[in-house]
């Protein structure tokens, strides 16, 4: 096969490749078998017309496009292998020459994986973070657990304060007319939670059960409902009841309520301390990893093709849809609730996608610079881990992974991250 690669501006180039006559003939034969099944030719049963009769009636050229469709995936794959390029998008293939009895000549405008110019990635300075759990952190966790056990009790003849929960009716009016979605009865609202638009909860502070009030507010300019954004409104409210939190004492009894496996507060503290210590060490390690990767990426130069960003954004959108589905929602319902559009969400995803693409490209370049190749032992160990995680046999995991290219790529990137971490300097 004759192949020619001409690099053009940026990450785009022109790939010229040929399909020799022997291969063309194979494609035409396969195309005829496919097409013949659908043909009705007088004098022959359906699907039984001979090749010679077909050529006489329709001409061999009638098979060219079907033959090309059959051959193109194989010959294009061989062409990019021979050219030594790594496409990142599906190309537009053009026919330069497709004559009967001659070699077919094709061209494709191909966007390829960009080259990465690495900067400094070893010996990078990172922040030294404290890994030891502090008394304050333990006390804060205990206080949260204590407050979760709090009970709401009715507040008699006392004004509402931040942190209280009020039961109220409300109805919103714009220009004296009630607007859609602005009404509720016996609604439970924790003051200070920020569930309502700015100012609403603050103006309930100081009211008592049985009080009625008109609350004048202006909707935020960025509010999702266009007819209300930036508009002045009045909410008529009536408070039915005010409840306040009654927090139990932090003692052995509360400890047993929080965790049935402990008998005393000291046992609970010890158990929580261990969990928090492990979580803090993991969090510090993660923060260090993110910082050192970010610095290596910042030091590198790479011109990222938009196609890579777009594909990654599509990938993120699919994950987003799956997360919504797990919550019993659909993207359509989410957009309806938030007032956002799919296009706006995709544009937002592209910002994250560009960062992810650059990070992966830089880590792959580091792996290449360090001559990192996963060993068979490392591959087998990872397969064992996956088999245990998903409850599968190792052979089934191997079959699902196919040529192992994705697994090998993941392992190489992990090793590249280890290179960054092992050489990082904490200051």
Swiss-Prot record:
It is an enzyme of class 5 (isomerase). GO terms for molecular function: peptidyl-prolyl cis-trans isomerase activity; protein folding chaperone; ribosome binding. SUPFAM superfamilies: FKBP-like, Triger factor/SurA peptide-binding domain-like, Trigger factor ribosome-binding domain. It catalyses: [protein]-peptidylproline (omega=180) = [protein]-peptidylproline (omega=0). Its main location: cytoplasm. Its EC number is 5.2.1.8. It is found in: Cytoplasm. One of its GO terms (biological process) is chaperone-mediated protein folding. InterPro entries: PPIase_dom_sf, PPIase_FKBP_dom, Trig_fac, Trigger_fac_C, Trigger_fac_C_sf, Trigger_fac_ribosome-bd_bac, Trigger_fac_ribosome-bd_sf, Trigger_fact/SurA_dom_sf. Keywords: Cell cycle, Cell division, Chaperone, Cytoplasm, Isomerase, Rotamase. Residues 163-248 form the PPIase FKBP-type domain. Pfam families: FKBP_C, Trigger_C, Trigger_N. Gene3D superfamilies: 3.10.50.40, Trigger factor ribosome-binding domain, Trigger factor, C-terminal domain. GO terms for cellular component: cytoplasm. The keyword Cytoplasm applies. It comes from the Bacteria. Consists of 3 domains; the N-terminus binds the ribosome, the middle domain has PPIase activity, while the C-terminus has intrinsic chaperone activity on its own. PANTHER family: TRIGGER FACTOR CHAPERONE AND PEPTIDYL-PROLYL CIS/TRANS ISOMERASE, TRIGGER FACTOR-LIKE PROTEIN TIG, CHLOROPLASTIC. Belongs to the FKBP-type PPIase family. Tig subfamily. Involved in protein export. Acts as a chaperone by maintaining the newly synthesized protein in an open conformation. Functions as a peptidyl-prolyl cis-trans isomerase. This is Trigger factor. It comes from Listeria monocytogenes serovar 1/2a (strain ATCC BAA-679 / EGD-e). The lineage of its organism: Bacteria, Bacillati, Bacillota, Bacilli, Bacillales.
């Amino acid at each position: 096969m004759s192949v020619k690669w001409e690099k053009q501006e940026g990450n785009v180039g022109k790939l010229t490749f040929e399909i020799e006559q022997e291969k063309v003939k194979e494609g035409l034969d396969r195309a005829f078998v496919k097409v013949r099944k659908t043909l009705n030719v007088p004098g022959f049963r359906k699907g039984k017309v001979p090749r010679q009769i077909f050529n006489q009636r329709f001409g061999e050229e009638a098979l060219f496009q079907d033959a090309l469709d059959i051959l193109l995936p194989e010959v294009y794959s061989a062409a990019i292998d021979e050219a030594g390029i790594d496409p990142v998008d599906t190309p537009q293939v053009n026919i330069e020459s497709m004559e009967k009895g001659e070699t077919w000549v094709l061209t494709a405008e191909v966007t390829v994986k960009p080259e990465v110019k690495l900067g400094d990635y070893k010996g990078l300075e990172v922040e030294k973070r404290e890994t030891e759990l502090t008394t304050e952190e333990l006390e804060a966790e205990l206080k949260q657990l204590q407050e979760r056990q709090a009970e709401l009790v009715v507040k008699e003849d006392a004004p509402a304060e931040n942190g209280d929960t009020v039961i109220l009716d409300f109805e919103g009016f714009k220009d004296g007319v009630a607007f859609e979605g602005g009404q509720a009865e016996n609604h439970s609202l924790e003051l200070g939670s920020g569930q309502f638009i700015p100012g609403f909860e603050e103006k309930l502070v100081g009211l008592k059960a049985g009080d009625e009030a008109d609350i004048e507010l202006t909707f935020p300019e960025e509010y999702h409902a266009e007819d209300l954004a930036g508009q002045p409104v009045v909410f008529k409210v009536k408070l039915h009841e005010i409840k306040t939190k009654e927090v139990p004492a932090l003692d052995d009894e509360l400890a047993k309520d929080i965790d049935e496996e402990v008998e005393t507060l000291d046992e609970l503290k010890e158990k929580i301390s261990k969990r928090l210590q492990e979580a803090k060490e993991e969090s510090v390690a993660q923060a260090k990893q993110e910082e050192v990767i970010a610095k290596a990426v910042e030091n590198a130069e790479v011109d990222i093709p938009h196609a890579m960003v777009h594909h990654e954004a599509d990938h993120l959108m699919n994950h987003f849809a799956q997360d919504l589905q797990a919550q019993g929602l659909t993207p359509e319902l989410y957009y309806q609730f938030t007032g956002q559009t799919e296009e706006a969400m995709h544009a937002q995803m592209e910002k994250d996608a560009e960062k992810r693409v650059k990070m992966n490209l830089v880590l792959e370049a580091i792996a290449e610079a360090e001559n990192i190749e996963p060993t068979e032992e490392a591959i087998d160990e990872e397969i064992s881990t996956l088999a245990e995680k998903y409850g599968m046999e190792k052979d089934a995991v191997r079959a699902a992974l196919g040529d192992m290219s994705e697994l090998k790529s993941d392992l190489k990137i992990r090793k590249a991250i280890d290179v960054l971490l092992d050489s990082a300097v904490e200051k």
